[in-house]
Amino acid sequence: LGPSDIVSDANHIYSELGFYNTQIGQAELLDRSVLTNEGKRLTGDSLFYDRVKGYGEAFDNVIMTDTVNKNMLTGDYCYYNELTKYAFATKKAVAVDYSQGDSLFMHADTLQMYTYYLNTDSMFRETRAYHKVRMYRTDVQGVCDSLVFSSKDSCLTMYYDPILWNNNQQLLGEKIMIYMNDSTIDWAHIQNQALSVEQLDSTSYNQVTGKEMKAWFQGGEMRKVDVIGSVRLVYYPMESDSTLIGMNVSETSLLNMFLENRKMKKMIMSPKSNGTLYPMLQRPPEKM
């Protein structure tokens, strides 16, 4: 077929080169043909579509956009089932969620999108990323092995060796849950073997470890951190000119930290601990 529009039910196909079998409802399309279904648009160098089974496949330079739920999938292979609303992408796969004020970008070996219906009038989407995951927003960036983002509660969960960056702060744990609001990150929960690291210079790092950590954000910056259970703190107090005074090592059960302009403003330990302050030239390497 030449330049053609094929319309059936809720579907629309535009193609300038391809074949469409009207008897079995199957199409094989080339030259950046486009399949549209209820606000979703699938295009690639080549397409296969089965109207009876309700699915389409796209190959090479694939873009799938969902204008209703405001997300996008790209890659060199994409599958979409219009009956279950399930989408799958691989080979240089990237997902973009632009349903909130700040877009969330996710890259992984494999990306999947699921649609769940709470009732006849309500639904939410879930994006799952597997292996070599990287995610980016203007306020936070992260890497991990697996990731799940749910539009139901705007929660992004990172699994297996997750690392999260916010400005000069680095957060690590066995699992990290990040809760978004419309325009920025709201708070994060770092579970099991939680660690926060802030680099001050080439050899000095503020470090906090604990069983778990809860971090609250405002305006895209970390403002308050609660560290709970088996807390160990390595902290470098500063002079007014930012000269490091020494290295303080403390241990406690609960630590509340308050930050302003990306710097420590106040710290509360329960029970209180004065710790040990080492001069800069006498820092024991095993405690750094």
Regions found by a protein language model. Name each.
Residues 1-288:
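Structural signature for solvent-exposed beta-strand/loop edge elements and short helix-capping sites
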